[in-house]
Swiss-Prot record:
A GO term from the CC aspect: cytoplasm
Lineage: Bacteria, Pseudomonadati, Pseudomonadota, Gammaproteobacteria, Enterobacterales
Keywords associated with the record: Cytoplasm, FAD, Flavoprotein, NAD, Oxidoreductase
Family membership: Belongs to the FAD-dependent oxidoreductase family.
General function of this protein: One of at least two accessory proteins for anaerobic nitric oxide (NO) reductase. Reduces the rubredoxin moiety of NO reductase.
Protein name: Nitric oxide reductase FlRd-NAD(+) reductase
Species: Salmonella paratyphi A (strain AKU_12601)
InterPro entries hit by this protein: FAD-bd_OxRdtase, FAD/NAD-bd_sf, FAD/NAD-binding_dom, NO_rdtase_NorW, Rbx-bd
EC numbers: 1.18.1.-
Length: 377
């Protein structure tokens, strides 16, 4: 008798995998185990909740029970997996255990909180539960410090500013989105945020936070201090790898998988933000969607290696949206930038004259798909 497939996690990757499995097999036993409620919500919406005056419960799209009925699943919400016995094919919680034929880790990634004095005063917005826990202080806060000027930090800074709050955006780097693109490309967004009223503290490092009567005092390494009502950590994500380590599979930055999404154990797979695919961590929607398609086939007996095409990454800053693709972080590219009132096109060219990366903004985003076709990968 088939023990079926167990998926640990209930986020976007887990749900996409369930949908793809059920397209091919309506009856294989499917069990999902997760620490949260397993209700569905759209994670990118978290970048806009404050300006849209949305509460955490407003984000829910489908209740867990409806999901289970629709796709013929066994769900175990609010359940912490404590151990995986890979040789015995058993998943354990504090009071239950489940046997499996195939196991999929879809455990996601956790927000990184800098290890500074007062770190417990930092809020994170990496999932619906985290927003639910801090929505009242965030809605009430007038002065907000966002630590981290990457994708999420930039999106949140614009959103809080649009909601009428006084926003300070801090980063160690000399420019925003520094891990994704050079300053001459990100400067358009940087200038727009400044024009909106966002106060940028670049080349700045947070040293400590302390509670004071008027809110929170944030002290920088330069010994300058600012007073705010709330501090948000947007300093990146760290793949959740603890369960994989307990199962004895190979872990690097994420759970190491090959082109078949298979870990070092033949019956354990990983997908989504927790996975490191052939050395790459790809915490974006499109690679997760494609991974789910291929993994569903392989779990059901197929043998199809994942092939990822050139893909767009979207920066969700509504007043100056950006799309980017390719190796935008490469330092050896020569950038050709055309900036006009309706938007920007920035092309990253190799020494051989090949298009290796591009960034487009505003009305020029309509040219993204044509550029994708000419991108050298």
């Amino acid at each position: 008798m088939s023990r079926g497939i167990i998926i640990i996690g209930s986020g976007f990757a887990a749900r996409q995998l369930v949908k793809n499995i059920r397209k091919q097999d309506a009856h294989v036993p499917l069990t999902l185990i997760a620490a949260d409620s397993m209700d569905e919500y759209n994670k990118p919406d978290l970048s806009h909740v404050i300006s849209q005056s949305q509460r955490a419960d407003d984000l829910t799209r489908q209740l867990a029970g409806e999901f289970a009925e629709q796709f013929n699943l066994r769900l175990f919400p609010h359940t912490w997996v404590t151990d995986i016995d890979a040789d015995a094919h058993v998943v354990k919680s504090q009071d239950k255990q489940w046997q499996y034929d195939k196991l999929v880790l879809a455990t996601g990634a956790a927000a990184f909180v800098p290890p500074i004095a007062g770190r417990e005063l930092m809020l994170t917005l990496n999932n619906q539960q985290e927003y639910r826990a801090c929505e009242t202080p965030l809605r009430d806060a007038q002065r907000v410090l966002i630590v981290g000027g990457g994708l999420i930090g930039s999106e949140l800074a614009m959103d809080f500013c649009r909601a009428g709050k006084t926003v300070t955006l801090m980063d160690n780097a000399a420019s925003l989105l520094a891990s994704l693109m050079p300053p001459e490309v990100s400067s358009r967004l940087q200038h727009h945020l400044t024009d909106m009223g966002v106060h940028l503290l670049l080349k700045s490092q947070l040293q400590k936070l302390e509670k004071i009567e008027a809110g929170i005092r944030a002290t920088l390494a330069s010994q300058r201090s600012i007073e705010v009502d709330a501090v948000i950590a947007a300093t990146g994500l760290r793949p959740e790898t603890a369960l994989a380590r307990r199962a004895g599979v190979v872990v690097n930055r994420g759970v190491c998988v090959d082109s078949y999404l298979q870990t070092s154990h033949p019956d354990i797979y990983a997908i989504g933000d927790c996975a490191e695919i052939n050395g790459q961590v790809l915490p974006f929607l499109q690679p997760i969607q494609l991974s789910a398609m291929y993994l569903a086939k392989n779990l059901l007996g197929g043998n199809a290696p994942l092939k990822l095409p050139a893909m767009l990454v979207k920066v969700k800053t509504p007043e100056l949206p950006l799309h980017l693709a390719g190796e935008t972080q490469r330092r050896d590219l020569s950038w050709q930038i055309t900036a006009e009132s309706d938007g920007m096109i920035a092309k990253g060219m190799s020494g051989e004259g090949q298009l290796r990366a591009f960034v487009v903004s505003e009305d020029r985003m309509k040219e993204a798909f044509a550029l994708l076709k000419t991108l050298s990968v």
